[in-house]
């Protein structure tokens, strides 16, 4: 696979984890799992088999730049990006992609949050590698989802269409934003 670049989104304030997470020191920088590593450090650790830290980019709030430098000291300073303004996910991704495109016009880009809970790291790496292999020679975007085990109203759902030429990779019919409980139950039943 060629020129893999990874964007790690780390700008949120983690208000749902208060009082552990505060606006000055949000959850992505805290050892919430009790393993001696913060969530962002665990994210970098599980991505290292995919690409080197030199090819990872963190997009964060200006006031968290120092924390990122402390927690990921081997990341190039130029790869730690301060969002000009907190505008949520899409502008964060666009900003980082623009920076990457200037240095790596043919990059195969992964976007991930800094605070995802990943239990089965080897399966995550396998799926991510498969997605990168698929996108390496196509003009395609792959989104990775997990099959829900129960109806959940706090997350969006991916409605899968037909299988592509690659096993486990489906075309997306639609993204269904956070549904009410009745709709979530219908998604689980289908």
Specify the residue positions occupied by each region the protein language model found.
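Conserved beta-strand scaffold positions in the cores of enzyme catalytic domains, especially
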Residues: 29, 80, 141-143
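Conserved N-terminal catalytic core of the sugar/cofactor nucleotidyltransferase
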Residues: 1-8, 16-19, 23, 34-113, ...
């Amino acid at each position: 696979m060629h020129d893999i670049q990874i964007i790690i989104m780390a700008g949120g304030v983690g208000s749902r984890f208060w009082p552990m997470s505060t606006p000055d020191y949000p959850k992505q920088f805290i050892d919430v799992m009790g393993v001696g590593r913060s969530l962002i450090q665990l994210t970098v650790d599980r991505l290292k088999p995919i690409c080197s830290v030199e090819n990872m980019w963190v997009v964060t709030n200006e006031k968290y730049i120092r924390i990122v430098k402390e927690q990921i000291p081997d990341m190039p300073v130029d790869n730690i990006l301060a969002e000009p303004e907190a505008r949520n996910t899409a502008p964060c991704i666009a900003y980082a992609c623009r920076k990457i495109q200037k240095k790596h016009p043919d990059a195969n880009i992964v976007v991930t949050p800094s605070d995802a809970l990943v239990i089965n790291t080897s399966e995550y790496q396998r799926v991510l590698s498969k997605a990168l292999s698929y996108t390496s020679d196509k003009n395609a975007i792959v989104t990775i989802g997990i099959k829900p085990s129960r109806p959940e109203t706090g997350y969006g759902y991916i409605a899968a269409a037909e299988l592509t030429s690659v096993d486990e990779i489906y075309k997306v019919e639609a993204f269904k934003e956070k549904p009410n409980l009745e709709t979530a139950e219908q998604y689980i039943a289908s």
